[in-house]
Amino acid sequence: MTEPAAWDEGKPRIITLTMNPALDITTSVDVVRPTEKMRCGAPRYDPGGGGINVARIVHVLGGCSTALFPAGGSTGSLLMALLGDAGVPFRVIPIAASTRESFTVNESRTAKQYRFVLPGPSLTVAEQEQCLDELRGAAASAAFVVASGSLPPGVAADYYQRVADICRRSSTPLILDTSGGGLQHISSGVFLLKASVRELRECVGSELLTEPEQLAAAHELIDRGRAEVVVVSLGSQGALLATRHASHRFSSIPMTAVSGVGAGDAMVAAITVGLSRGWSLIKSVRLGNAAGAAMLLTPGTAACNRDDVERFFELAAEPTEVGQDQYVWHPIVNPEASP
């Protein structure tokens, strides 16, 4: 394991878990055309994967984070070097296979963005268990654990439930941002779940075409004990916050996006930083909304600027409370959508 920088004992520590990290490569081309050889611009390399992105933004915002992740091969070595250069503390579980790459191609002529995501390496059972062992030790002294991103090929879909069980035994709040089977197999133990509408739709098995349906689905997860709090990111339309007793709508922050990468991770990071400061959920989600907007100003997967986050935070309107009578839930039962 590697940890190039010590954490500040005076600050609440945030542990992030990234089971499928990536070396993010961003480049540009005039026009994307099939079959032709396209001459691209100089590449930009960034350390990536959900939890790693969260740790980078926590660091930018002045929080104290340690990124925990498996890594291997030359891509894993470069990813670690980039994190070290950024001053983000990390702990690595060495694996035999090589860390994956992901590619973002910006088409200059149209301002369109193309994102290509590789599946990632398979982890042995021993490597998977070592990740949990490292988390178990780290969670005991953490203020929050953030598990974010996809699971690698071959890892059981209930892996994040095992993460939740570890956090529950450590009395450490878990913030989860994932999709697919990793999300669908969560049954309990999550403090805050961040989901897009698509991810929420997959989780409950309904189309969720309207805001009342989206809020009702979020409350369904809370009522079933799968999470205590649900934040639904709505992209350009803002966000929703659901707790056991209330719901709030957060408006989007007007701005012109440069990139569509990383806004969700920035939102999760800023929410966690806010909570680690002792802020209310509402204030923390306002900060998350601001960080998500600030992330859209950066090229590729570069971290957002703290000044932009603070500026957008000041611009962000207070949320609107949504009455319970506006989101009565009539679920469409999908036996494959929930455990």
UniProtKB/Swiss-Prot annotation:
Q: Which residues bind ATP?
A: K37, K194, A195, S196, S233, L234, G235, S236, Q237, G238
Q: One MF term in GO for this entry? A: ATP binding
User: What broad class of enzyme is this?
Assistant: transferase
Q: Which InterPro entries match?
A: Carboh/pur_kinase_PfkB_CS, PfkB_dom, Ribokinase-like, Tagatose/fructose_Pkinase
Reply yes or no: does the keyword Lipid metabolism apply. no
Q: Which UniProt keywords apply?
A: Acetylation, ATP-binding, Glycolysis, Isopeptide bond, Kinase, Magnesium, Metal-binding, Nucleotide-binding, Potassium, Transferase, Ubl conjugation
Write down which residues bear the modification named N-acetylthreonine. T2
For the ligand (K(+)), the binding residues are S259, V261, M295, T298, G300, A302
Stated induction or repression of this protein's expression: A member of the dormancy regulon. Induced in response to reduced oxygen tension (hypoxia), low levels of nitric oxide (NO) and carbon monoxide (CO). It is hoped that this regulon will give insight into the latent, or dormant phase of infection.
Which positions bind Mg(2+)? Answer: E199
The annotated active site, in chain numbering, is D265
- Industrial and biotechnological uses noted in the record: Has strong T-cell and IFN-gamma inducing capacity in human tuberculin skin test positive patients, indicating this might be a good vaccine candidate.
- Cross-link (Isoglutamyl lysine isopeptide (Lys-Gln) (interchain with Q-Cter in protein Pup)), chain numbering: K283
Name its co-factor(s): Mg(2+)
Looking up PANTHER family in the UniProt record yields: 1-PHOSPHOFRUCTOKINASE-RELATED, ATP-DEPENDENT 6-PHOSPHOFRUCTOKINASE ISOZYME 2
Q: What is this protein called?
A: ATP-dependent 6-phosphofructokinase isozyme 2
**Per the UniProt entry, what species is this protein from, by scientific name?**
Mycobacterium tuberculosis (strain ATCC 25618 / H37Rv)
